[in-house]
Amino acid sequence: MEARNSEQRLFTRLVADAASCTLCPAMCDRSAVLSSLNGTLAARVMFIGEAPGRKGADRTHVPFSGDQSGKNFDRFLASISLAREDIFITSAALCNPRTDSGANRKPTKTEVANCSHFLRRALEIINPKVVVTLGSVALDALKTIHWHDLNLKESAARIYVWHDRLLVPIYHPSPQVLASHRREAAQLQDYQLVAQAIEQAGLYQAA
């Protein structure tokens, strides 16, 4: 119980620090998507995305919710009987990056670097046995915490040992990725590998 209370105190501090961060001038008016809505601190599986979407998590404050990427993500989780209640979800950049016209954009390397200490602290607090990166930005973000030489195109849908954990790099569930880089059938197969990693880590049975 004392350990759990310590984790909660550390997480509460992390949330407060992320909320008050002003390192990225282009995102100072955005809210960091990091709270109890990201998942349970007891999670042994952590999913890391790119950044909150304008119509999704930036609006709902729940990672991968409120937009088509979130719907796709929920469908893929359900395919291996994995519930949000069992996992923790965060992202390489905690705030929503936008273009001058207001559209979503990828976070810059500087923005990801600015957020890297939040990601590192989240990993330390939750201490997951399995880390699943969703897309190349998330995979590259891990390099700032513990070096790896993986790239998504060559390393997707394989299980690696990274930083004393199992790492599964897979593609992002966005409609654009599904239409151009990784079709639904392939992504569903990728999630079967996530289930395999979960079983390999001795956590719980995924269907």
What positions do the PLM features span?
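A polyanion-binding, active-site-adjacent surface
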Residues: E2-E154, Y160-Q205
